């Protein structure tokens, strides 16, 4: 099965746009309500520890820092956005690109919280769905 070039270009635009929108929303929350922003350096630290065989941490913040972890984290954040968008476009058979509607994109976007809830947060030492954080409900709502 080949993926058409316009699917890929559409997914790149959607993925970057969605990631940028998420970053702007987090910036708004930080400046308006003093809610701490997501730290993509920690994502980079997690990824940079993987080649050494470490996939889970008791506390990602206590894990030794790695060179270029912030750069890796930010690149990964946008790459993950593009990959999620590409999966969405493929699942929608590309029809959604020709006639985009909010509901399928919104439902898919909500579904993507499975990744941070059940993979990233437990691997960072934060528990399933941020259950080991001081404010787990706030963390869950921010993931949406």
Predicted regions and their residues:
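Juxtamembrane/disordered regions of integral membrane proteins
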Residues: 1-144
């Amino acid at each position: 099965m080949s993926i058409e070039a316009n699917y890929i270009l559409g997914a790149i635009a959607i993925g970057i746009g969605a990631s940028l929108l998420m970053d702007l929303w987090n910036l708004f929350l930080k400046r308006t309500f003093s809610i701490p922003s997501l730290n993509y350096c920690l994502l980079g630290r997690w990824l940079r520890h993987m080649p050494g065989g470490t996939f889970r941490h008791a506390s990602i913040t206590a894990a030794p820092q790695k060179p270029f972890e912030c750069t890796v984290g930010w690149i990964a954040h946008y790459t993950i956005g593009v990959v999620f968008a590409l999966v969405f476009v493929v699942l929608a058979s590309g029809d959604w690109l020709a006639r985009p509607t909010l509901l399928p994109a919104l439902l898919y976007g909500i579904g993507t919280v499975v990744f941070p809830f059940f993979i990233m947060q437990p691997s960072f030492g934060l528990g399933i769905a941020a259950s080991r954080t001081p404010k787990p409900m706030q963390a869950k709502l921010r993931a949406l």
